[in-house]
Amino acid sequence: MEIRAAEISKVIREQIEGFGADAEVSEVGRVISVGDGIARVYGLDKVEAGEMVTFSSGVQGMALNLEADNVGVVIFGSDLEVGEGDTVRRTGQIVDVPVGPELLGRVVDALGNPIDGKGPINAKLRRRSEEMAPGIIPRKSVHEAVQTGIKALDALVPVGRGQRELIIGDRQTGKTAIAIDAFINQKQVNSGSDNTKKLFCIYVAIGQKRSTVAQIVRQLEEMGAMEYSIVVAATASEPAPLQYLVPYSACSMGEYFRDNKQHALIVYDDLSKQAVAYRQMSLLLRRPPGREAYPGDVFYLHSRLLERAAKMSDKMGAGSLTALPIIETQAGDVSAYIPTNVISITDGQIFLETDLFYQGIRPAINVGLSVSRVGSAAQTKAMKKVAGSIKLELAQYREMAAFAQFGSDLDASTQKLLNRGKRLTELLKQPQFHPMPFEEQVVSLFAGTNGYIDGIEVSDVNRYEEAMLSYMRSSHNDLLATIRETGDFSDETKSKLTAALDNFAKIFA
């Protein structure tokens, strides 16, 4: 084969001209010290706050403290895999997670990796964990109801789509139970084909026991609620940085639905454990402690998370993200640091009491201390008309009950008020995993506020309610359907319902 010098020189010239002079520069630092999930790194001069870094062992971390001579990195994993002198590389990326409908029905960790053994998640989109909350102009007032299926909530402390309603109470008072019941109650609305009415659910477990998370997942699966839910978990055995990060990651998953003309409901269980994880990280990073040893920006920790829950304007697609943060109190002390912070950020609170719980009043909602700052704007017309008087009657009952302990001779009107109050309190009791459809709640509360249960023994109120609803389903299903479809309670519906309840009163014994 003949070799031509001209061809060789041409090839060499082309190679020289096409040679890329831009060498890839990757900034590398070294670990000075490591311990308690924190690594001090030297040499990452251009690293940005919140940037992901990778250690030579493959473990990831996040740069949180940028100091003059070193960088404080929190480790997303075991610090046993990171040693002094190890190399650390910048990734140039902020923490992001997979988002989209592909996550529905799955259990993932704080970084969006599946932990349910059902294979990889092929999400088409990713989104940063920390996103800016929507401004004032893209928002709209809350005006649609989130039907929780819990009578005491839907009637007295209504939650609207886009609202932030705090669930607060001591341990073992049924905080998580309220959230799970709200998830289960979305089954009917999610079985339809209209995506703008559906409400997707996200449960965020922060610092919970693994057995507790497994139990919640099993309950959601048994009730058929897992298919429209995502469970995001950073359990008690996981490092503090992941417990700190998990609410933000889960919120990004919820924001996908909010920004795509859909609706999502997110439960943070619970934010006191996130604050404890953040306090641990801050103290180890040598940040100055404040009240109760929490860092100075612990308010901002929760406010920047909860502000991301919003009802978007029609121009922005009219989607919404509703947040139900949970806070655990110690011995009912709502004036502690974290509870007061979160109460001031949210649009109302559901206050659960141990005493009520042990008296058998479940859900153990203290109606006097619980409030929704959105109020009746988040209720349907039917519920507004029926539940308007119940809150006042219960408030009067509690006031009178306190006085009645001291006096035995009470006049007839006071006696009537006390009797009605006892029966209404009984009517608002509800077993767990039995959320009630909206139209049945309306009928039940109408019977309660219009004297149909006044002549019934307190112990028979629940039996009356079950029998009455069963009668309504079998004989007056059209009436229930009208309330459900119109969401209103017209005079015609009222007269029909009154006649039906009068009829039932004759046959109930």
Curated annotation (Swiss-Prot):
Catalytic activity, EC: 7.1.2.2
Catalysed transformations (reactions): ATP + H2O + 4 H(+)(in) = ADP + phosphate + 5 H(+)(out)
Residues reported to bind ATP: G169, D170, R171, Q172, T173, G174, K175, T176
Gene3D superfamilies: 2.40.30.20, ATP synthase alpha/beta chain, C-terminal domain (1.20.150.20), P-loop containing nucleotide triphosphate hydrolases (3.40.50.300)
GO molecular function, one term: ATP binding
Any one GO cellular component localisation term in the record: proton-transporting ATP synthase complex
Membrane disposition: Peripheral membrane protein
PROSITE patterns: ATPASE_ALPHA_BETA (PS00152)
InterPro entries attached to this UniProt entry: ATP_synth_asu-like_sf, ATP_synth_asu_C, ATP_synth_asu_C_sf, ATP_synth_F1_a_nt-bd_dom, ATP_synth_F1_asu, ATPase_a/bsu_AS, ATPase_F1/V1/A1_a/bsu_N, ATPase_F1/V1/A1_a/bsu_N_sf
Keywords: ATP synthesis, ATP-binding, Cell inner membrane, Cell membrane, CF(1), Hydrogen ion transport, Ion transport, Membrane, Nucleotide-binding, Translocase, Transport
Cellular localization per UniProt: Cell inner membrane
UniProt family annotation: Belongs to the ATPase alpha/beta chains family.
HAMAP family membership: ATP_synth_alpha_bact (MF_01346)
Assembly mode: F-type ATPases have 2 components, CF(1) - the catalytic core - and CF(0) - the membrane proton channel. CF(1) has five subunits: alpha(3), beta(3), gamma(1), delta(1), epsilon(1). CF(0) has three main subunits: a(1), b(2) and c(9-12). The alpha and beta chains form an alternating ring which encloses part of the gamma chain. CF(1) is attached to CF(0) by a central stalk formed by the gamma and epsilon chains, while a peripheral stalk is formed by the delta and b chains.
Protein name, as recorded: ATP synthase subunit alpha
Organism listed in the record: Zymomonas mobilis subsp. mobilis (strain ATCC 31821 / ZM4 / CP4)
